[in-house]
Regions:
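Bacterial N-terminal signal peptides
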Residues: 8-19
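A phosphate-binding catalytic loop at a beta-strand-loop-alpha-helix junction
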Residues: 125-135
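Bacterial N-terminal signal peptides that target proteins for export
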Residues: 1-9
Length: 194
């Protein structure tokens, strides 16, 4: 009597494991990024940052596995080119989050960048003219999320291209409200925090 029960139990467990395998999607093998006219930084796997790619870079970027391009340039910065059309012609998804200089590095744009990154399916390229705004906005986003300390977020931003925008990010992180958010990840506020 025990043997049929044990056999049925093992069979049921095996079928359960096999059913679970059907829904598991294997992660794509990492692609080697072909050469482009610009330096592509990789502050973390699946996230590329850069200055302005040339029109003929999009095919190489797509071949390297990127699926989404997030452009932080403000309207009018890129004259005589339709970047959205170029990106889409290469088979990539295009997202525009206009960040006008260091002053455009703010909480609203950090939230917009977080939403765009979360919505992306696969590797992402985030760019501006030089990578400076990209690194600054990524640093602010990471500090505000509470996943990194402010210093870790600043280091992450530097690895993504932040240079002169670091002063703006530091200003936001040391302001009373910014300090409170960075310390708590936006959850319970310590005494004295708004």
């Amino acid at each position: 009597m025990r043997k049929p029960f044990a056999t049925m139990f093992v069979l049921a467990c095996s079928l359960g494991l096999l059913a679970g395998c059907q829904t598991h999607r294997a992660a794509p093998a990492p692609a080697v990024m072909p050469a482009t006219s610009i330096e592509l930084r990789t502050p973390r796997p699946g996230l590329y940052t850069a200055g302005q790619p040339a029109a003929d870079d999009w095919a190489a970027i797509a071949a390297g596995g990127v699926g989404t391009v997030i452009d932080l340039r403000a309207p009018g910065e890129l004259k005589d080119r339709d970047e959205a059309a170029e990106v889409r012609a290469a088979g990539l998804r295009y997202v525009s989050i206009p960040v006008a200089g260091a002053g455009g590095i703010d909480d609203a744009n950090a939230k917009a960048l977080r939403a765009a990154l979360d919505a992306a399916d696969g590797p992402v390229l985030v760019h501006c003219a030089s990578g400076n705004r990209v690194g600054g906005l990524l640093a602010l986003m990471q500090a505000r999320s509470g996943t990194m300390t402010p210093e870790q977020a600043l280091e992450f931003g530097r690895s993504a291209g932040m240079a002169s925008t670091e002063a703006r990010v530091r200003e936001l992180l040391v302001a009373p409200e910014g300090r409170c958010i960075a310390q708590t990840g936006g959850s319970v506020r310590p005494e004295g925090c708004p």
